[in-house]
Amino acid sequence: MAELIGAEGLSTFFRQHGVPEIVIFAGKGGLGKTTSSASLAFHMAVNESKQTLCFSTDPQASLSDIFERDFYGKGDVELLPRLHVVEIDADRRVADYQAQVKKKIMEMYGLDAVPKEIDEYIDSTSAEPAMYESATYDAMAELVAQRNFDLYIFDMPPFGHGVRMVAMADILSRWVDKITEARTKVAEYEAVAASLKGTKATEDLVLKELSGIRTKIKIFTDMITDRQRTAFFMVLIPERMAILDTERALHMFRELGITLSGLVVNQVYPVEMLDAPGLSNFTRKRIEMQQHYVRQIHQQFGNAVVATVPMFPREPKGLEMLQEVARYLMGEEAQQRV
């Protein structure tokens, strides 16, 4: 006899823990992070009347494809009343940041143009791995700091990029602290020298800039590690490699101070298909394999599983399909049987 699995949906989670200010979906690419993000955003805006912002931090994912409207690089776009979508153009944001750095160098040193060597070095930083992460979490922190929405839903990059993005915040924070410490000592010497000369020390624009960077980093790290404000969900499918990847990712995220709120098991074939006449042997084997791994997920992760979402007969894109996905994600439909 098949038995019900105890994944009651995000509605139950929100009733028990309250609706957070921020929801983050993470996981390996192609498993349903973006679909989960878009479906939850649609549900919370339309059915729960929450002012909701859905933000993609994954350059490979596409909220534009799922919502069937172009958001890329267009800033904050209102899709529906109470539902806004942002898909950042990280390359353009990095280019804008580089332009700001050049402008500040010219202002600080009274230059008409940035010296050629420095200009080339700044341009070369766009190839640095940290630049994308920096641009992305900078955008995330700015959006949350503005406090324009009840709920922020972030679609994180795949595991490797997601972990690196979070780790980079800690690395940059330490780097900024070291530079600030050194710069503060220089500023103290400059102040003493100015006092001896009877002149007034000029404002240290470098320290001011470093302080701004540190503030943004702190906003980001505080945001994703605060369990009162943020719910962190991981999406996986019932396959061996997905389970192993999830284990590794959970370990890495724990080391970075991020606590899992729950798991969403996605793309699960309805077990009722086993009773369908004419079912192919291939499909039967796939369903049986999935049932095995669904059991393993529940045994291994226990009550961490908060929702089970089935495999749908067509691609989950467009508002009608997102509403269907949301019914399972929120737990409004019957749970998966194994």
Report the location of each language-model feature.
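Nucleotide-state-sensitive switch-loop elements of NTP-binding domains
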Residues: 2-23, 28-31, 36-211
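C-terminal lobe/tail of nucleotide-utilizing enzymes
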Residues: 1-17, 70, 220-338
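Electropositive phosphate-/nucleotide-binding environments in soluble metabolic enzymes
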Residues: 134, 214, 291
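C-terminal-of-GTPase-core extension/linker across diverse P-loop GTPases
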Residues: 204-220, 242
